[in-house]
């Protein structure tokens, strides 16, 4: 049997929701991001506090009042995750999904709602010999061999127009997106290729200490010659 809900106490640690209010929380539909994505209903009710109940949240969502990355989403289970931009036109407000100090997802109000940063996780050849870039949230766009896996690209949404290209290289500004250091920002100090089935390792130079983590947890957010991320990270 397919589980439509999951127990609130067993919800992913990225859910910043009360654990002892009620027994069940909505389970996200298959779609963008991974199992730690937030269902849109939970975001509207528990994070943005636009509704007191699930029924009220579903009504808001089904009325088309919530946009994710510039597109109206009416599925209350639609998965929302890192760097997604959630817009409420009636309130003239937009939020980017980021991390709080404990590595949990939190919506932070931003002005650059027309921009989203993507990590390139793979490249494939499609019909006509064109290169398709496979991005971290399941998005696919056509690109070129100038783009490498682990690089990031800045897109204008919802058009998916490329605005900038951020290379995965020493000195690049990065955010750690998994593990105990999720949400911390630093610069790539070194990159170690592991000659085994184990993941490659990246050492990130932080403000107070160096952090070594796996490459999957490293997301380029700024260029090596810049002191600022290319999007508003609320820091």
From Swiss-Prot:
GO terms for molecular function: rRNA binding; structural constituent of ribosome. SMART domains: KOW (SM00739), S4 (SM00363). Gene3D superfamilies: 2.30.30.30, 2.40.50.740, RNA-binding S4 domain (3.10.290.10). InterPro entries: KOW, Rib_uL2_dom2, Ribosomal_eS4, Ribosomal_eS4_central_region, Ribosomal_eS4_central_sf, Ribosomal_eS4_KOW, Ribosomal_eS4_N, Ribosomal_eS4_N_CS. One of its GO terms (biological process) is translation. PROSITE patterns: RIBOSOMAL_S4E, S4. The keyword Glycosyltransferase does not apply. Keywords: Ribonucleoprotein, Ribosomal protein, RNA-binding, rRNA-binding. Residues 38-101 form the S4 RNA-binding domain. Pfam families: Ribosomal_S4e (PF00900), RS4NT (PF08071), S4 (PF01479). GO terms for cellular component: cytosolic small ribosomal subunit. Transmembrane segments: none annotated. Belongs to the eukaryotic ribosomal protein eS4 family. PANTHER family: 30S/40S RIBOSOMAL PROTEIN S4, SMALL RIBOSOMAL SUBUNIT PROTEIN ES4. This is Small ribosomal subunit protein eS4.
């Amino acid at each position: 049997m397919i589980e439509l809900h999951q127990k609130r106490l067993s919800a992913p640690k990225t859910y910043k929701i009360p654990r002892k209010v009620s027994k069940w929380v909505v389970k996200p539909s298959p779609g963008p991001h991974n199992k730690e994505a937030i269902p849109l209903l939970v975001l509207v009710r528990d994070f943005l506090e636009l509704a007191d109940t699930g029924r009220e949240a579903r009504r808001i969502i089904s009325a088309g009042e919530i946009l994710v990355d510039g597109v109206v989403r009416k599925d209350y289970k639609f998965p929302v995750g890192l760097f997604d931009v959630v817009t409420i036109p009636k309130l003239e407000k937009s939020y980017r999904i980021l991390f709080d100090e404990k590595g949990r997802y939190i919506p932070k109000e931003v002005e650059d709602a027309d921009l989203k940063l993507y990590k390139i996780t793979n490249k494939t050849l499609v019909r006509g010999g064109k290169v398709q870039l496979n991005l971290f949230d399941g998005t696919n766009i056509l690109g070129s061999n100038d783009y490498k896996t682990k690089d990031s690209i800045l897109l204008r949404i919802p058009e998916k127009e490329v605005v900038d290209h951020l290379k995965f290289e020493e000195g690049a500004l990065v955010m750690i997106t998994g593990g105990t250091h999720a949400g911390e920002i630093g610069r790539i100090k070194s990159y170690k290729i592991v000659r085994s089935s184990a993941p490659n390792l990246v050492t990130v130079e932080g403000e107070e200490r160096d952090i070594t983590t796996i490459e999957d947890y490293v997301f380029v957010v700024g260029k090596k010659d810049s002191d600022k991320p290319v999007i508003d990270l609320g820091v």
